[in-house]
């Protein structure tokens, strides 16, 4: 390690990615030398609207620059379509894929906002997105980072996207002929995962970095930085939680994109009516909409505190003095919640009151 430290850049596609980036930098910057080296945050607009996160990230003091990234999907370039046809022949398909990989990486050049080669460490969340093709085509080494907590356990995109002759394709990616994400590309130095032991298929580049290590020893000041970066009007929220009506008891309701909108309103009204009191006393109700929930909770549940649906639920772990008497979810897994005395998971049986089980695949909402 040089006396100047190592300069860093992070490519993020979601708020969760930015959250993990924030945690990583809080730890790295405990070393003054690394803090001086600086970090740049790149926010890709390809699949997510970050709103004014850029401004709040700039104010956090963690980044020397926060830049928007107009990352382009392959469909933006119609000339690539010819390389995506199935010829019915493995050799021809692989030759087409080689051409696709090279051409896609080149076409992205005008949309890359920084010179990646000037950074010592490049961290990419979800390198299956176009940025992975760009870096591999231009022979730039990078670190891949797990898209979500243990996400490869639930959906191994590298193997699924390349099912059929996977070993051959992995060999080709290792030699940078084609591109495969999540640790299989030549220019991917390592693939950070939370827990390698739970992953059914080993990969030599998996690097176990438990997310718990990023959260267990945060100072109060560091927690305040996290909250300030992801929650707008932080001070106003904290005052409301401390002094607002029925603040002595708190209940958090996690919404989900269930059923049609009218049924959804009824579901959450019923939940609040049944579980919104603690020991017979009305509680202060907070609602955290699911990122894909389009119901207007500000309008339909205006008497309650409606949290921004964009920020990761884990951020609530760091709000000063925030403890919930009860957290209620229908189908959402609540393992990441550390701030509740009671977690109430209502499950499939509860949903059967509102909808026949065969109508939808409910697992798709969690």
Model segments located where?
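Conserved nucleotide-sugar donor-binding subdomain of glycosyltransferases
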Residues: 81-129
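Conserved nucleotide-sugar phosphate-binding/catalytic loop shared by glycosyltransferases and other
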Residues: 38-86, 305, 309
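Short internal beta-strands
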Residues: 36-46, 143-145, 285-290
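A nucleotide-sugar donor-handling region in carbohydrate enzymes
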Residues: 160-249
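A donor-sugar binding/catalytic signature common to diverse glycosyltransferases
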Residues: 21, 315-359
């Amino acid at each position: 390690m040089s006396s100047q430290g190592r300069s860093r850049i992070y490519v993020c596609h979601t708020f969760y990615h930015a959250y993990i980036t924030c945690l990583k930098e809080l730890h790295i910057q405990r070393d003054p030398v690394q803090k001086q080296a600086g970090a740049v945050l790149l926010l890709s607009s390809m699949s997510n609207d970050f709103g004014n996160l850029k401004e709040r990230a700039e104010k956090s003091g963690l980044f020397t620059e926060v830049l928007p990234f107009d990352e382009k999907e392959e469909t933006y370039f119609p000339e690539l379509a010819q390389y995506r046809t199935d010829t019915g022949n493995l050799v021809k398909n692989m030759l087409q894929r080689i051409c696709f990989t090279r051409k896609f990486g080149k076409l992205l050049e005008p949309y890359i906002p920084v010179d990646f080669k000037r950074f010592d460490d490049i961290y990419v969340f979800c390198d299956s997105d176009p940025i992975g093709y760009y870096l591999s085509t231009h022979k730039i080494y990078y670190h891949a980072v797990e898209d979500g907590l243990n996400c490869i356990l639930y959906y191994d995109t590298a193997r699924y996207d390349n099912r059929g002759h996977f070993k051959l394709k992995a060999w080709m990616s290792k030699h940078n002929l084609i591109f495969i994400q999540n640790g299989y590309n030549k220019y991917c130095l390592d693939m950070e995962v939370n827990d390698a032991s739970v992953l059914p298929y080993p990969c030599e580049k998996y690097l176990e970095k438990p997310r718990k290590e990023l959260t267990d020893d945060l100072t109060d000041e560091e927690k305040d930085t996290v909250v300030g970066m992801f929650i707008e009007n932080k001070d106003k929220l904290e005052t409301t939680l401390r002094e607002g009506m029925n603040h002595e008891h708190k209940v958090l309701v996690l919404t989900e994109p269930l059923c049609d909108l009218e049924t959804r309103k009824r579901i959450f009204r019923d939940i609040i009516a049944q579980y919104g009191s603690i020991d017979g006393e009305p509680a202060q109700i907070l609602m955290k909409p699911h990122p894909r929930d389009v119901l207007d909770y500000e309008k339909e549940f205006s008497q309650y505190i409606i949290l921004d649906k964009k920020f990761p639920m884990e951020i609530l772990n760091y709000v000063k003095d925030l403890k919930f008497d009860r957290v209620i979810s229908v189908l959402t897994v609540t393992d990441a919640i550390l701030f509740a005395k009671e977690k109430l998971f209502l499950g499939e049986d509860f949903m059967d009151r509102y909808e026949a089980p065969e109508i939808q695949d409910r697992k798709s909402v969690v």
